[in-house]
Amino acid sequence: HKQQHQTYADDRRQIGIHQPPTHYTIICFPHTSIPIGLKDSEISKKMLIFVEILSLKTAAMGNSVKRVLFVNSEIFPYLPESEISNIGRYLPQGIQERKKEIRSFMPRYGCINERKNQLHEVIRLSGMNIIINDVDRPLVIKVASISAARMQVYFIDNEDYFHRKQVYLDENGEFFKDNGERAIFFARGVLETVKKLRWAPDVIHCQGWISHVLPLYLKKAYKDDPIFSNSKIVLSVYDDTPAADFPEDFKDKILF
């Protein structure tokens, strides 16, 4: 198991991802963890336990769960296998197997092979621009399918932010200086795409640091939007963030 875990760690370092996260915490929900190396059926069983908890907790807030939006930093097999990418892969499947509607999003990092994974652009969802720091950048939406799970994954893409081969760290292991802008673009790209889909989620599950700007936008900029008016937020926190700070002007760039 240690040798297998080291292989995953090496794979992740090669494409500029921090060490494999080892802790997983759901804010306001019980602690859970999925060890690497479980068979698909075993992982799905553990996912279903979490789904039960999620459904009960949300029902206690006065809402039944029908639609769950997943905003992921990583999903296997598009990035190397790890705890966080396994959860991005199998948790939506577990929810879907309970007859719930799901939508999954992640960034379209440059290391993802579009031909191998059969990504294609969704023209009707692409075309808008997102302004960050007075600069317009086009939002491109791509989609691929995980056939074994009968599940679609939406990818947020932009040439400036997501076409580099490394994920979060440069070739010297340094945090990209524009990672804050990338997180902003990703969060707003997801929310604007969900609005275009006219798909109102009951629960929005954010996992991985690059998704953590999204709850702030929901509480502030999108708080009066009817698509998100009844959405509950679940935030998963990992130790996947390098010891780096966003630039001082991040707080200005996040405004729009």
Task: Describe the function of each predicted region.
Residues 17, 56, 64-66:
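Short, positively charged low-complexity motifs
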Residues 25, 40-42, 46-57:
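Short, positively charged and aromatic/hydrophobic N-terminal segments
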Residues 3, 7-8, 35, 46, ...:
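N-terminal hydrophobic alpha-helix used for membrane targeting or insertion
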Residues 49, 61-256:
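Catalytic cores of nucleotide-sugar-dependent glycosyltransferases that transfer UDP/GDP/TDP-activated
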